[in-house]
């Protein structure tokens, strides 16, 4: 993954997110859906914690809306669009504003929290996050931890959660969906690795 990100001038997160977009595109195409020009909006957390506080417990992030270019057929162009969107979002104040709104909601009455969260959730189809895990094996009571995985929390009417985790040199892609919208998430998951391999092949050919 780092080979692709360095060669193409983007982040590891951009590469993994573009691979997820490719997997969604492939799935929808096999269903016969019209995806010409289609974008899916995902809520993505952006870390706002300063580096000097990296080891402190707790969360310190803002939420931004990322448009996933499902309709883009070219894998390289798809990655470029994801990377450009992420750069623009990181340079904007959207994450800081989102953090402030979430903090204010947390201090407000419960009767306002639910409708407010529902309003935010209507603006997105999915929530997606990539968590960089430890790149060396962990041990618990002397036993090696073979794999790690997490499931991104969802709220309101959002029907898809995209989870990406790196651990001990491997990348794990998970998907949690509303069965009424995506009854077979495994069909999307199995497309993730081939989509990444397309980007890797493009990188090696250049």
What are these regions (language model features)?
Residues 155-206:
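Extended, hydrophobic beta-loop-alpha segments that form or line the acyl/peptidyl-thioester binding
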Residues 7-52:
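Hydrophobic "lid/gating" helix adjacent to the active-site nucleophile
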Residues 121-163:
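Flexible, Gly/Pro-enriched loop and linker segments at secondary-structure and domain junctions
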Residues 8-9, 67-72, 177-182:
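A generic structural motif
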Residues 1-10, 82:
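Surface-exposed, Lys/Arg-rich phosphate-binding patches that contact polyanionic backbones
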Residues 35-38, 58, 119-122, 154-158, ...:
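A structural signal for short secondary-structure junctions
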Residues 50, 54-134:
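Helical lid/core segments from catalytic subdomains that handle acyl or acyl-like groups
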């Amino acid at each position: 993954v780092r080979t692709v990100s360095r060669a193409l001038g983007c982040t590891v997160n951009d590469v993994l997110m573009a691979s997820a977009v490719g997997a969604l595109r492939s799935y929808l195409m096999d269903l016969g859906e019209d995806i010409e020009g289609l974008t899916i909006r995902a809520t993505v957390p952006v870390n706002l914690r300063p580096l000097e506080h990296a080891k402190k417990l707790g969360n310190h992030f803002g939420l931004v809306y990322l448009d996933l270019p499902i309709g883009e057929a070219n894998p390289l162009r798809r990655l470029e669009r994801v990377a450009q969107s992420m750069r623009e979002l990181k340079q904007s104040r959207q994450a800081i504003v989102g953090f402030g709104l979430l903090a204010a909601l947390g201090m407000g009455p419960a009767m306002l929290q639910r409708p407010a969260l529902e309003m935010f959730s209507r603006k997105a189809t999915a929530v997606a996050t990539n968590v960089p895990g430890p790149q060396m094996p962990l041990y618990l009571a002397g036993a090696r931890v073979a794999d790690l995985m997490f499931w991104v929390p969802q709220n309101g009417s959002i029907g898809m959660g995209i989870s990406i985790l790196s651990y001990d040199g491997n990348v794990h892609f998970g998907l949690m969906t509303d069965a009424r919208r995506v009854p077979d998430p495994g069909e999307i998951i199995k497309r993730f690795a081939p989509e990444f391999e397309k980007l890797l092949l493009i990188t090696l050919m250049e």
